[in-house]
Regions:
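A surface-exposed partner-binding patch
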Residues: 1-113, 164-166, 170, 188-201
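Residues in flexible loops and secondary-structure boundaries
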Residues: 45, 66-67, 116, 127, ...
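Short, surface-exposed beta-strand/loop micro-motifs that present aromatic residues
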Residues: 115-122
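A short, sequence-level motif marking secondary-structure junctions
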Residues: 122-126, 148-150
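A short, charged helix-loop
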Residues: 128-132
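Compact, glycine/acidic-enriched structural inserts
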Residues: 133-163
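Mixed-charge (acidic/basic) macromolecular-recognition segments
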Residues: 148, 157-183
Length: 201
């Protein structure tokens, strides 16, 4: 396994002075997805909790109230979209092979432009999963030779090479923008029963 770049360093680079201490029942979260999840992602969730980067890249988190940004709900949403596209055009190839297909793509994030970001679940060890993406429109696919933490480090410093991701227009490194994970009336997604929470001070 490659030496992962530290989540604590990622947090420091992104402007967090301390962990937000977001707590998840990982047994429940992984059961909802149907697989173990990478250790760097779990550490990220504890440090960062709900939120995104530069009002552009959103990382999905287990247990939040907003279905649009909840990890298992995001996977279900992608499957719903794939079924709808197949009904409209039965002969069309799927945009991406979705988990739980062998080696299927498991969504962990998206951009406000509709681009999707995924783990490629090849092999048995989640800590070896790499990252891939697809644009909001079209059938192109792009691959990143690294894991979740490495991708986010590259995103913060604007060195990700995916054709549909634009160059950063903000100062570097890109800053993290925290969120509560709550559903907003009239917003995207649907309200869920939240099971994740921030640790009490």
């Amino acid at each position: 396994m490659r030496d992962p770049l530290g989540i604590e360093q990622l947090a420091h680079d992104a402007g967090l002075s301390a962990s937000r201490r977001y707590l998840v029942d990982w047994e429940r979260a992984e059961a909802a997805i149907g697989t173990r999840l990478p250790a760097d992602y779990k550490e990220y969730v504890h440090w960062f909790g709900p939120g995104g980067f530069d009002e552009y890249l959103i990382v999905c988190v287990p247990g939040v109230e907003n279905s649009n940004t909840e990890l298992a709900a995001r996977l279900a949403h992608e499957h719903d979209g794939a079924r709808s596209r197949k009904q409209i055009n039965p002969g069309a190839s799927p945009r991406v092979p979705l988990f739980p297909e062998p080696g299927g793509w498991l969504p962990w994030g998206f951009t406000t432009g509709g681009d999707g970001l995924y783990w490629v679940t090849s092999g048995g060890d989640p800590d070896r999963w790499t990252v891939a993406g697809r644009p909001g429109r079209g059938s192109d696919r792009a691959y990143f030779d690294g894991n979740f933490a490495e991708f986010l480090h590259a995103f913060l410093w604007d060195t990700v090479e995916m054709p549909f991701l634009p160059e950063a227009e903000c100062d570097l490194p890109v800053r993290f923008e925290p969120d509560t994970g709550k559903w907003r009336t009239g917003g995207a997604g649907e309200p869920l029963d939240a099971c994740g929470h921030f640790a009490l001070e």
